């Protein structure tokens, strides 16, 4: 994600995070500092053509193969998040869940959300939907057009398994692996 974020819309006019310098082509860091010099339209096109579009095409191809073979595809979009809000984040509330489930009204069935929530709650984890992050990745070829493609984003709060300052694993890591 230092150069390009393949989970963003390639058109900054469609991508809310572009206002934070974190659209398809990143121009700022998580703490709001400049990541690079201003990106020219030509350089942006080169970055998208070199990294974004090949990734998107490869992901689309995998989804197409799964659909051909099974008739449906479930994407589990895995991420982690800081225990305290970072400057770029739209949600600055300090009380954060253990698990964030990002959903899309078209691609995330309620049964999938309820099932994941139940598994997490049974482990004593606090789960919120679309908070502090919202949405989930679906290749643009299928986005809001093909109901056979299901997707949910699952974000795990980092302090549950690592020391956020050093990156060292903590005793909570085995529990999160489970």
Predicted region positions:
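N-terminal catalytic or cofactor-binding beta/alpha core of small enzyme domains
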Residues: 1-178
